[in-house]
Amino acid sequence: MDYEALKDQWSDVEERDGIRLSWNTFPSTRMEASRLVVPIAAVYTPLKEKPESPLLQYEPVTCKAPCRAVLNPYANVDVRARIWICPFCLMRNPLPPHYKDITENAIPPELHPQSTTIEYQLARPAPAPPIFVYVVDTCQEEDSLKALKDTLILSLSLLPPNALVGLITFGTMAQVHELGYTECAKSYVFRGSKDYAAKQVQEMLGLLAPGPRPNVPQQPARPPVGPAARFLLPVQQAEFQITNVLEQLQRDPWPVANDKRPLRCTGVALSVAVGLLETSFQNAGGRVMVFTSGPATEGPGHVVGPELKEPIRSHHDIDRDNIKYYKKAVKFYDALAKRAANNGHVVDIFAGCLDQVGLLEMKNLSNFTGGHMLLTDSFTSSQFKQSFVRVFDKDANDNLLMGFNASLEVLTTKELKVTGLIGHAVSLNKKSSSVGETECGIGNTCAWKMCGIDPASSYGVYFEIANQGGPAAVQPGPQRGMMQFLTYYQHSSGHYHLRVTTVARPLSGPTGDPALAQSFDQEAAAVLMARIAVYKADVDDGPDVIRWVDRMLIRLCSRFADYRKDDPTSFRLEKNFTLYPQFMFHLRRSQFLQVFNNSPDETAFYRHVLNHEDVGDSLVMIQPTLDSYSLEHEGSQPVLLDSASIQPTHILLLDTFFHILIFHGETIAEWRKAGYQDQEGYENLKALLEQPKEDARELIADRFPLPRFIVCDAGGSQARFLLSKLNPSTTHTTGGYGGGVTSQTIFTDDVSLQTFMDHLMK
């Protein structure tokens, strides 16, 4: 089968099952697996939208404990004897009575060969409607606060009518607004400088009265009773009150001297929000949405002092350990993040500020709970407004696309063991026969809790081969290894859903089976390795991680490339390996591993987004796409990410996922400034200038977070965004800049790979 046909097959599987594997044939022994260099792993998108597949309105048929695998197309079903054999543990299970009418030709949907991914609506209702707590920073300029209030008021109309909404505002103090009190505006005030224990918060808010007990089913239609109902009201009942309170929000009245930062107690506000949901709504889906316009400067979790002369920490300070607030703040926010994750609640962080706000310290609030993280210059920007509205996207039945309180469990057949997950989740510490001995990412468990999950949420799941090898280990006949992914989540319609994906792949034959190399998916592998590199970069030194990336690439090439010793020119890679070295070249230059020129907050944001997206979008972040437009060609043409692609008569469109940039070559820019496009007879120039804008609009259409849109000319200051991504060819400097300026510092792709190959031969 040629590579193109294989690629089509893999993308069909991705469409159907939301999964891409690094190797589509599994090695049969652990020894063989270790020689593959890239681990056996999957990028899995559990909630990938599948509008055409049916939602099954009954409970799934499961295997006996401890296996609990769900009936799937790979199970052997004996129609006459009414039994099925589980492919994971080989146990025989009776089919339930309502399956009595099945025949060879009439089988239930979950046994259809195409039903490798299927979704069940479970009978178990959600304990409460979805909850949204807005936590709003009032230490900001009037125009920015007004823009934020308008966006929040607009968002009320996007929530399900039964959703519960709460409001906490913070500046020097944190205030919990009692929305249920209609006579006048009433709020509970917490001192910004004090670290409140969870119990204190709950006592002060009067929440320790007997609330709805967990594990006792409640009718989903009734709004919850209990003390928290004063602070959290159903939108349909209280939209007017909430709108009123939001409209009347004022800037924080505390005076701020010119040489000081405003006192901002982000930590206290977050701790109160988590405490509010913890008592009455444990394991009910909820989101704490924080809107901050500056760093926390007071109380627990502050990241910088109030004096402006003291700058907020940079990467350089962190490297030199010159960080007096960092460790304490991280410890505080991590403890909060763990509490929120255990309760099943999501924390989203929206920053509207030109300076850093302390995302680096707060990042695990979103990373542990599956929350969103958004970094914008101001709440007045369209980037913030449009991205925020996109959080509330709905499906065809007008249900929110976000799932709440989710968990993912992975089962494997005896050949495979799961070693861990890299993505936005925490471990559920569940042990089973599927758990491996080694650890990659969040390991030593076969189940993880996500809290927040949406149709784009993707997870890297890593595996190892259990089989030690030896003559008895290889059985005759074709073998296959299997994995099953079970995703439970609270759907916004008020029911729990279960999405089941079952994957089977052949096991390789005896050592040296060529099927292994042919089954390598270089795109999925690059993304899975990038996730490991970023995971390492959070704990290890930057240069060490880049050395690790290089080492892994050298080992992969020495294993799979054809070359004659001491003859670099003889180096050849198979078609499905050729792009992998350049993905790695761009990964090591990317903002995920090179922190130079980015603030620690930006680095935390970029890494957060990489760990959320699927293979296609992650690849755009690692190796941006570049398209060229000119009068000679109709439409756009993909060109190399290289300074040789800059031509005076071409327009370039660069997509880095976070930025979309239109770059006008020198001549085109001069024509445009001279106004030729508005003159008669130059319609083709006008069309040429419009075309990239149209294409950029399409790229932006369904992307979250909304990318920054930049239009620039050759030689303009904004052109730096393009130049920093290009591979500077040293062979020909383009028009005297671009290549010429940077070619001394960064070697070209070819040279680096060439040196690389020379080292390899040695």
From Swiss-Prot:
InterPro entries reported for this sequence: ADF-H/Gelsolin-like_dom_sf, Gelsolin-like_dom, Gelsolin-like_dom_sf, Sec23, Sec23/24_helical_dom, Sec23/24_helical_dom_sf, Sec23/24_trunk_dom, Sec23_24_beta_S
Residues where Zn(2+) binds: C63, C67, C86, C89
Signal sequence coordinates: none
Entry keyword set: Cytoplasm, Cytoplasmic vesicle, Endoplasmic reticulum, ER-Golgi transport, Golgi apparatus, Membrane, Metal-binding, Protein transport, Transport, Zinc
GO annotation (BP), single: intracellular protein transport
Gene3D superfamilies registered for this protein in UniProt: beta-sandwich domain of Sec23/24, Sec23/Sec24 helical domain, Severin, von Willebrand factor, type A domain, Zn-finger domain of Sec23/24
GO-annotated molecular function: GTPase activator activity; zinc ion binding
Membrane topology: Peripheral membrane protein
GO cellular component terms, semicolon-separated: COPII vesicle coat; endoplasmic reticulum exit site; endoplasmic reticulum membrane; Golgi membrane
Subcellular location: Cytoplasm; Cytoplasmic vesicle, COPII-coated vesicle membrane; Endoplasmic reticulum membrane; Golgi apparatus membrane
Keyword Cytoplasm: yes
Function, in words: Component of the coat protein complex II (COPII) which promotes the formation of transport vesicles from the endoplasmic reticulum (ER). The coat has two main functions, the physical deformation of the endoplasmic reticulum membrane into vesicles and the selection of cargo molecules.
Subunit structure: The COPII coat is composed of at least 5 proteins: the sec23/24 complex, the sec13/31 complex, and the protein sar1.
Family statement: Belongs to the SEC23/SEC24 family. SEC23 subfamily.
Official protein name in the record: Protein transport protein sec23
Organism name: Aspergillus clavatus (strain ATCC 1007 / CBS 513.65 / DSM 816 / NCTC 3887 / NRRL 1 / QM 1276 / 107)
